Every structure is written in C-alpha cells, then in structure tokens.
Amino acid sequence: MKNIFKKLLIFMALLLFSCSPDNLTNENETITNSDSNNPGILKTSTSKISNTGTSKIWNFDNLTEWEDATQVGNPNYWIENGNLRIFANPNTWERSKVKTISSFAAGTYRWTVFVPEMGVGDMASIGAFLYNNDTHELDFEIGYGKQAIRDQLAAEPDDLIVYMTSQGYPFQSVQKKIKRGQWYNLTLQLTLTSNGRYTVSWKINDAIMATVQLSYGKTTKFKIYCSVENLQFIGDQIPQSQNYALFDAVEFKGI
C-alpha cells in the first residue's frame, strides 16, 4: 500500500511540474493576423518573434499594419491582384504614400517592385525608403531622371535612373541605370558597428550598388514607405503622364 501511495505522489508531482508556466516558452511564437486562417488571404502579413530578432513579410493582400502617408493630393492606391498599386496623376504635385504603423531598426529591408515605363522627362519618382525625419532617411527613388544625369550615365531610351540616397549624417547620393518594365528586389541592409552605429548598403537584385557608414545608430528607428511622388529633382518637366508602380511584397528581417 505504501509503495502504491509513493508512486501516486511521484506521478502527481511530475504532472504538476510538466504544466508549470515557468516551463513554457514563446521563443518561436508565430503571431498572425486574425484572418490568417481564411484561405482567401493566405498571404496576409505574419510576424515571427524570437530572442534573436523579428521577421515580417507583407504580401499586400490587404493593408493591415500600414497607414496612409500621402502629403499632396488624394490617396492614390489600392490592392490589385495581390499587389499594392500606387500612382500619381499628370499635371499635379501629388505625393501618394503608405507607411508601416510600426518602426524598425537594424536588419534587412526588401521591396519587390515592378518598375514600368515612365513619362519621358517627367518629375515622378517611385519610392522605396526608410524614414525617421528629413535628415534620417534612406531612399531608393526611381524615375526618368534629369537629362544632365542621363547624359552623364549614357542612359538608353529604355533606361530609368535609380537614386540611392542617405539624406544626412552623412549625405550621400549615388545614381545608377536600370531597365524599365521589370520586377526588382530593392534591399536596404542596416548592420551595426561595434559602437552601435549603422552601416547601410543599397542592393538591387542582391548586387551591392552603394554603401555608407552613418554617424547614427540603433536608437534611430524607421518606418517603411512605398510611394509614387511627383518631385522636381528627378526630371525636367511637371509630369505629363500618370506614373505608377506595383509593390508585390515588403520584407523585414531583424538582427
């Protein structure tokens, strides 16, 4: 009888220990949108949180976790066949933008974007960028480009110009040619130096195009933007065409 009682006590102790909250972990917890079980929107954004960082993918079946950031004109964007279609109208200075509600720091940011033909000479920019304030901003901006820059780069008629810019601390802007009518992966990679400052690299289809060491670091966080804006620096005339872009996905992988 004593042996049976002892075995029963041991069994109960093991059962209680195995259910203790102290033994549970959320290291690999997957947090999904409340609609994630709906098969019609399988690409909704998910977030996987662990002790080593955060990763998120937005596939643009909806605009969950994004908000309007339009500065001039109406919000010219919608979801179309699993893409974010965003545009700016001719003969305006419209600046159509969306941004993430949350802010992010060191890691890899990637935009998958279709770059169409754009109006010849139009002051219009497709933007994929990170923004904290006007001097803490890291950009991809794609447009027809001013003729002087096109001449300098020996651009062909089917070339567009991509500007890869740090707006401050320090300021740096690098211009390259890309072909219109193609999908691109645009990547900003922010790593940390030993003193906690950012080094940023601009990549197009995983090839490094530019790099700069910034004088600020991990205490500066950014919101992620997608945009089409009519901006004077990137062409020679007020836009004569409606210019647009398609964003298929945005991804962030923290470190």
Placement of each model-derived feature along the sequence:
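Short tryptophan-centered beta-strand motifs in secreted/extracellular beta-sheet-rich domains
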Residues: W111, Q182-L192, V200-W202
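Ligand-recognition surfaces built from glycine- and aromatic
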Residues: T108-R110, Y216-I255
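Extracellular glycan-recognition surfaces and repeat-rich motifs
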Residues: N62-L84
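Beta-strand-rich interaction surfaces with strong enrichment in secreted/lumenal proteins
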Residues: R95-S102, Q172-I178, L214, D236
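Bacterial Sec-dependent N-terminal signal peptides
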Residues: L14-S50
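Secretory/extracellular carbohydrate-interaction modules
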Residues: A88-D158
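Short carbohydrate-recognition loop motifs
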Residues: N76-T92, D158-V162
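Short, aromatic/His-centered strand-loop micro-motif at the edge of beta-sheets
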Residues: Y163-N185
